[in-house]
Amino acid sequence: MNTILAQQIANEGGVEAWMIAQQHKSLLRFLTCGSVDDGKSTLIGRLLHDTLQIYEDQLSSLHNDSKRHGTQGEKLDLALLVDGLQAEREQGITIDVAYRYFSTEKRKFIIADTPGHEQYTRNMATGASTCDLAILLIDARKGVLDQTRRHSFISTLLGIKHLVVAINKMDLVDYREETFARIREDYLTFAEQLPGDLDIRFVPLSALEGDNVAAQSANMRWYSGPTLLEVLETVDIQRAVDRQPMRFPVQYVNRPNLDFRGYAGTLASGSVKVGERIKVLPSGVESSVARIVTFDGDKEEACAGEAITLVLNDDIDISRGDLLLAANETLAPARHAAIDVVWMAEQPLAPGQSYDVKLAGKKTRARIEAICYQIDINNLTQRDVESLPLNGIGLVEMTFDEPLALDIYQQNPVTGGLIFIDRLSNVTVGAGMVRELDERGATPSVEYSAFELELNALVRRHFPHWDARDLLGDKHGAA
């Protein structure tokens, strides 16, 4: 067993008290990314090693694996703690997105180790989609490369505002301050083109030797800033969703018996209280919150990120994919939008193609109307293209089969982010971030009688194969 962990548990007064203390720590999700062999996996292994998160059996296994697959001679190859796939160990690269967990006395962390090779950019985008901070590794011998620019742009495109530029392998350039200063200046010049108001920090380090990772380096006395671990422990993550209006996508209608009907999901943004008036989209029907049910019992209020079940005072028609928001909020469903796309399939994305798209719990179909441009990640310029290739990033105009309640991605990633699904293979082929909504052709408001609405709901519920259109959602089909 990890002796440090055992000591922490003893200090807290037992396992239960330790687990409660862990629950109250803040959580930081971050990813490591950069060019091939910049030392991403080694850095994560060093963090785990120097924060004493490795168990004795893991350390013993690491010694054996280092002899068979290691690339560091007689030294421990800390990258093997993360490179779990056999193909990764044999090739000496990271292929899949590897997730690891560790904690310190101040904070707990979830790490995503993402691939450096260009052909695995789609894997990197997947890892970045849930993170608050990105560590961009740069080889001190090579400086800023194309893949560094690509990963920087993808990170900011996916809403990451905190970038830590870790200039690694300083031991191979004799820990020279001028090398660090030159790379820092080069990156800041490039970063002027990145979108948004970014928090960028620079740390010179050596993941292999441990310099400035968890402890200050005696080899770089010219650097007076914090270590990488200190940056991770103290960075103030301001999540935009905490300040946004309430959004609650319904993931599941929970009805275990005739006396209970609740709507389960994760509160995407804002907060909700018992007694608050809410509105359901796309129907527009209003009700009020009777209960907020959680695993730990009922609550009076829930905040963004909490998994909850809402019980309403009225028995109304709500299905998976519907969106609940405050009754006084206005969010007009849209059928047209401009979407930033990261394409992940071998077959290029082209105008005229149709895909299934999934947004929160909602699944519908969409058609590609036009590709506005592809972004050249070397200089972040826009160029006209007829199609978007594998790993291509560009702006696309789309039309949905039915009006969707959408937010701008930078304001709310949950209700502004979607994935493209191939209709034949059911494989995820792309990721989309809503840039701009277009309300042209919005369906005019039509008043239906209560009988018409109830009959329509009855037919759609019990005879889905009729493909009856939703009178309130403008879902076209044959009645």
Swiss-Prot record:
GO MF entries: ATP binding; GTP binding; GTPase activity; sulfate adenylyltransferase (ATP) activity
The annotated pathway is: Sulfur metabolism; hydrogen sulfide biosynthesis; sulfite from sulfate: step 1/3
Where on this chain does GTP bind?
A: 34-41, 113-117, 168-171
According to its UniProt record, this protein's enzyme class is: transferase
Transmembrane spans: none
Region of interest (G5), residue spans:
206-208
Catalysed reaction equations from the record: sulfate + ATP + H(+) = adenosine 5'-phosphosulfate + diphosphate
Where are the residues of the annotated region G4? Answer: 168-171
Catalytic activity, EC: 2.7.7.4
Q: Which InterPro entries match?
A: CysN_GTP-bd, CysN_II, CysN_NoDQ_III, G_TR_CS, GTP-eEF1A_C, P-loop_NTPase, Small_GTP-bd, SO4_adenylTrfase_lsu
The annotated region (G2) lies at 92-96
Q: Which key words tag this protein in UniProt? A: ATP-binding, GTP-binding, Nucleotide-binding, Nucleotidyltransferase, Transferase
Q: Where is the tr-type G domain?
A: 25-239
Q: What biological-process terms (Gene Ontology) are attached?
A: hydrogen sulfide biosynthetic process; sulfate assimilation
Q: Which family does it belong to?
A: Belongs to the TRAFAC class translation factor GTPase superfamily. Classic translation factor GTPase family. CysN/NodQ subfamily.
Tell me how this protein assembles: Heterodimer composed of CysD, the smaller subunit, and CysN.
Stated name of the protein: Sulfate adenylyltransferase subunit 1
The species is: Salmonella heidelberg (strain SL476)
Gene name as annotated: cysN
